Amino acid sequence: MRIVFMGTPDFAEESLRALLEAGEDVTAVFTQPDKPRGRGMRESFSPVKALAAERGIPVYQPVTFKDGAATELLRTLAPELLVVVAYGRILPQAFLDVAKYGSINVHGSLLPKYRGAAPIQWAVLNGDKTTGVSVQYMAAAMDAGDVIAARETEIGEFETAGELFDRLKTLGAELLAETVRKIASGSVIRVPQNEADATYTKMLDKNMSPIDWNKSPREIVKHICGLNPWPVATTELDGVSFRVFGAEYTDARTALAPGKIISAGKAGIEVACGGGRSLRITEVQAAGKKRMSAAAFLLGHPMKADG
């Protein structure tokens, strides 16, 4: 079955690699145009383009899909299946309708939950116990197509969005390869999504970073984990602002107001939270410095307990 693959970041690269390792006939790849990256702002390939070039697969990078040229190009490639994974752009229906067996997409949630951007991060931010990946047929509405495969996984209590991203990247790639085989054999089953259960997410931004110490310890831990590796949780304690990469629960109860320092030492920085509880900050990063343990940070930035 002739497959045209569309994707850009490393999440998509692993899916492309899985198809190639499974022996699928990927005849062409579409990826976003090269963009300047790094301090020197040099143009660099996307992970998907790099893999395609390594394997000798033709790569196309249309700047626009509005003029119909990309759709005509796809028709000349005559794909039987279009696979889209984190391409990074909404595609016109005429483009999605070209492939004989349709267009499918890998999404980082158990649809219809968390349609849209950053589903992996929001699963962590919201404190979900489980999440997963879905393979869907692409529809006109965002992430609203029939689901043809899904796989669930537990979220670790202190698992970061970055760590979960890496796991779902692999899980999604494996599920995609299995699903493509089923499409080829005609054994795939389409399950319409229940619109009543649909939820939507939004992009993350730096305005979300500050920790709200009025929240419960678990909500704050999930805030820290969900914003790691970007945009990263931040706070200001004892007049010092820093990024927070790690924290742990304590059994302590406190009468101090949320955001007050209970203790600061070798174990970390214990801070009062909502509900008379607390948590301990264990890993931080000061401006212009490397990530370090809270204990190491305190050597250069000693803090006084408020109670």
What are the residue ranges of the model-derived segments?
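N-terminal Rossmann-like dinucleotide-binding module
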Residues: 1-40
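Acyl-group handling in specialized metabolite and lipid biosynthesis
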Residues: 202-215
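Donor/substrate-binding cores of folate-linked one-carbon enzymes
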Residues: 22, 32, 81-200, 207
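Conserved beta-strand segments of alpha/beta enzyme cores
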Residues: 25, 56-58, 102
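A residue-level signal for conserved active-site and pocket-lining positions in enzyme catalytic cores
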Residues: 7, 29, 52, 82, ...
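N-terminal glycine-/serine-/threonine-rich beta1-alpha1-beta2 phosphate-ribose binding loop
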Residues: 32, 36-78
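An anion-binding loop in the catalytic cleft
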Residues: 214-307
